[in-house]
Each structure stands twice: as C-alpha cells, then as structure tokens.
C-alpha cells in the first residue's frame, strides 16, 4: 500500500474447493492468513488470477467464478473492505451484463478518494451479438461498498486472454493492454483517464505482430509522478523479445523501445519503479532451466544490472511472477512447482 506495507494473496485448492486468502508482512514475518472467499465452482487459472488491492481506505479482492457450463463462462466476483467499518462486503459481480461469457484479466488501482478503478476483459459481445463480436476492454470505478460509480467500454476489440495493467501517473490513471486489429495484429495499446474521459487508445509502439491466436502474455505498466514504464513481450517473426518504453509526460508519449531480452525468454513480465527512479522489469529466462530475472534501468533507459532471482519452470503451472517496490527494495513472488506447489517470496535490495 502507499505506506510501504506488503500484502500477499494466493489461492489454495483441494478436492472440494478453492480458497482465496491473504497475509501482511510484518517485522516478525507474515501475519496469520485471512480468508477472503472460498467456493466450489471457481475458475482457477495460471494466467488469469485474483488481485488484491490495498490502500489506507481499505481493500478490494476479486476471484473468478463459473457462471455456466461453458469452459470459459466465468464472471468476476469481488469483495470490498472499508477500513473505517472493518468489514468485508458480501461478494458481488462487478460487471452488470448478466451474460455467461469470459470475464477476467483484472487490474486494480486505488484512487485518492477511496474508490478503486478496476479494468477487465469482457466477453459479452462474443456470445451476445450476431455475428459474434470480439473481446472488449471495460473499466469501472467502485466505492468501498462495492457500488459501481461509473463504467466505460474502453476498446471494442482486444486480445482475448492477455493481462491488463494499470498505474497512477501525476496526470491520472493509465491502462495498458494487448489490442487486436481486424488483421490480427496484437500490439500493446494504452488509454488514459483525463478530465473524466478516456483518451482514444494508442499503440505504445508498432511492433506489427500478427498472430492468429492469443499469446497469453500481457503488458505491465508502472508509474511515478510523470514517469511511466511499460514492458511487454512480442514474438514477431518467431523471435521472442521483451521490450521496455519510458515516458516523461504521464504516458502521453513514449521513447523508442529498449530490448530487455531476446530471444531467450517466454515473457511473463512485470514492472515497478524504485524510490531512486530506477525501473525494474521482471521476466522469464528460458536458457536451460527457466529462471526468474530482474533487469534494472535508470531513468534514461540505461541498463544498470541484471539479477537472477530463482529457478523456475517454463510450464504454465509456474504462473506469472509479480513484483512490488518498497523504497529501493523489490519483493518478488512466484509459484514454485517443485514437489508440492508453494508460493515463495524474495526481497532484493538495490
């Protein structure tokens, strides 16, 4: 949260049900786990996973729950926790379409008035329209009671199963995601909330990656004041590549891309910014056994260091590593699938 406290959420499963829980890191270690929700009909997925958003006014957490018998008929369920009431709301569905279709790939961003900006991929048009439409990107602002303050469709045609990502700039929120053109070009786009309206989505760089299916590899954005960093994966011409662009004007314009790694990667990126202004990009190295890597850049995009965090696996079960900065330290969390799967956390001090 904004005070520098670290919270970790995870999903555990047994034969009967799935459980979403969280814990807070204290000076003595992790405090007791607290259960947010549990259920027997959840959609638990390696790439589309729950998010916990925390600030001084409270918390928001979501999970995915099956809504019909189709493989990808699932909805986004959420609970909201108001700090002043010290209670969680009843679970609610954050989208109001009532259509059994794919809804997921959520990102959350606390706003300074105690509300939360939630963005998600929404498949209502894929089953509701004739002929079937495409996956859409939607966003809404929710208060701590779970009420929907406002909602928008941000893009009418996006990649079906790549994560969305959001960050707060000095000039307001920015959301990045993988677009999908009529010609099946799936490049990374951004839209910003300016004076109550969302800007026309723009490509952060024209990779012109034409691919007939979803690569399941979303972008990641981090921001500090007017500085914005976006990292993403593409494999145009079958050459895997992670790139990074920087902005000094809250995402209005971006630098030319910096190649973080190519070709020994399968993506799965995340980004964060240290108090020093250094930018950290996490990514997967696929040379030999897979490894979780951190690359550190200065504000001008110069590479300062590359750190191997841990061995991993290229399999889907290992999921997507997540990073968060506190001061000039980075916390990394990932799923270790050796023997019994478990969630691990490491701290790297810079």
Language-model-detected regions and their locations in the chain:
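Extracellular, repeat-based ectodomains that mediate carbohydrate processing or recognition
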Residues: 1-350
